[in-house]
């Protein structure tokens, strides 16, 4: 099912970007 795979890939990418932004904001706030 290519639709399910593409949806899962998009969800994984969104989660990764959110985690990176969250960690980046925490580091900036720490400094």
Curated annotation (Swiss-Prot):
GO biological process, one term: photosynthesis
Principal place of residence: plastid
TM helices/strands, residue ranges: 4-24
Domain of life: Eukaryota
Pfam families: PetL (PF05115)
GO cellular component, one term: cytochrome b6f complex
Localization in the cell: Plastid, Chloroplast thylakoid membrane
Keywords: Chloroplast, Electron transport, Membrane, Photosynthesis, Plastid, Thylakoid, Transmembrane, Transmembrane helix, Transport
InterPro entries registered for this protein in UniProt: Cyt_b6/f_cplx_su6
Keyword hit for Electron transport: yes
GO function term, MF aspect, one: electron transporter, transferring electrons within cytochrome b6/f complex of photosystem II activity
Claim: Transmembrane helix is one of the keywords in the record: yes
Mode of membrane association: Single-pass membrane protein
Assembly with partners or alone: The 4 large subunits of the cytochrome b6-f complex are cytochrome b6, subunit IV (17 kDa polypeptide, PetD), cytochrome f and the Rieske protein, while the 4 small subunits are PetG, PetL, PetM and PetN. The complex functions as a dimer.
Its biological purpose: Component of the cytochrome b6-f complex, which mediates electron transfer between photosystem II (PSII) and photosystem I (PSI), cyclic electron flow around PSI, and state transitions. PetL is important for photoautotrophic growth as well as for electron transfer efficiency and stability of the cytochrome b6-f complex.
Family stated for the protein in its record: Belongs to the PetL family.
Protein name in the entry: Cytochrome b6-f complex subunit 6
Organism from which the protein derives: Silene latifolia
Source species taxonomy: Eukaryota, Viridiplantae, Streptophyta, Embryophyta, Tracheophyta
């Amino acid at each position: 099912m290519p639709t399910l795979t593409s949806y899962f890939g998009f969800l994984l990418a969104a989660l990764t970007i959110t985690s990176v932004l969250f960690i980046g904001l925490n580091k900036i706030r720490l400094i």
